[in-house]
Design a protein with these regions (language model features):
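Surface-exposed patches in mature extracellular/periplasmic domains of secreted proteins
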Residues: 60-62, 144-150, 164-176
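Bacterial N-terminal signal peptides
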Residues: 7-15
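A metal-dependent hydrolase signature that marks the N-terminal structural subdomain at the beginning
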Residues: 18-105, 109-112, 117, 211
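Positively charged n-region of N-terminal signal peptides that target proteins for export
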Residues: 1-4
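Active-site recognition of the HExxH zinc-binding catalytic motif
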Residues: 129-156
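Long, well-structured alpha-helical subdomains associated
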Residues: 164-212
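Sequence contexts marking disulfide-bonded cysteines in secreted/extracellular proteins
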Residues: 61-63, 105-107, 152-154, 195-199
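Second-shell loop/turn segments in exported
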Residues: 32-37, 120-125, 138-145
Length: 212
């Protein structure tokens, strides 16, 4: 997902590379670790949330700044990314079902899940909302949706559930979902749809008169 001033995040579903070498840096072995840490790791709790949203097993990999930069160079040099990951907060690789999150997205999830931060506003709140939306978005790619506009619209509607699965109260999850929806128009055009609205074709709960 493309990042814009910690307000919106744009995710990528990277194509399978028929000409790819046997492994990329993103495929390196990682320790499984939860809690408040910033090292590169497989994050089991975030993976369980992604699996619940996707309806199938999902692995979530959190990356340190240095490792994220290495992945960026690796993907660009081998044709695996259409744009620099410098502006992307996460991507999903369908060849192995892994969700990869950048340091900012993982930090936001750590703030919410392990540090117990519940800010009313400001940069930390925006980072948490971005992180929740990124995880929901990539989970929708894992579920099988490829189109970015469809994927993001479903993610916006699942941000409340995502936040609660990560430990947020109903009231805080509601505020996170509303923040993500307020930031929705700031996404690039390919992530937007006029049908992403209450009663629209992409409404996951058309009988419920509320949004998102």
């Amino acid at each position: 997902m493309r990042r814009l001033a910690l307000v919106v995040a744009c995710a990528l579903a990277l194509p399978a590379l028929a000409h790819a070498r046997s492994s990329f840096y993103a495929d390196k072995p990682l320790p499984t670790r939860d809690g408040a840490t910033s090292v590169s790791r497989i994050e089991p709790r975030f993976g369980r949330v992604a699996s619940s949203l996707a309806g199938k097993p999902a692995q979530v990999r959190c990356w340190s700044p240095l490792d994220w930069a290495r992945i960026n160079g690796d993907l660009i040099s081998h044709g695996g990314a259409r744009e620099s990951l410098d502006y992307v907060s996460g991507f999903y690789w369908p060849t192995n079902g892994r969700i990869h999150l950048d340091p900012t997205a993982c930090a936001g999830l750590v703030d919410l899940t392990y540090r117990g931060l519940r800010p009313d506003r400001g940069r930390t709140f925006a980072r948490i909302a971005l992180a929740v939306d990124t995880l929901a978005h990539e989970s929708m790619h894992r579920r099988g949706f490829v189109n970015e506009a469809v994927t993001e619209c479903y993610a916006v509607q699942l941000n409340y559930r995502t936040a609660t699965l990560l430990g947020a109260s109903s009231s805080f999850a509601y505020r996170v979902a509303q923040q993500s929806w307020a930031a929705y128009p700031l996404h690039p055009p390919q992530y937007l749809s006029t049908e992403c609205r209450n009663g629209g074709k992409l409404d996951l709960s058309p009988k419920r008169n509320s949004w998102p």
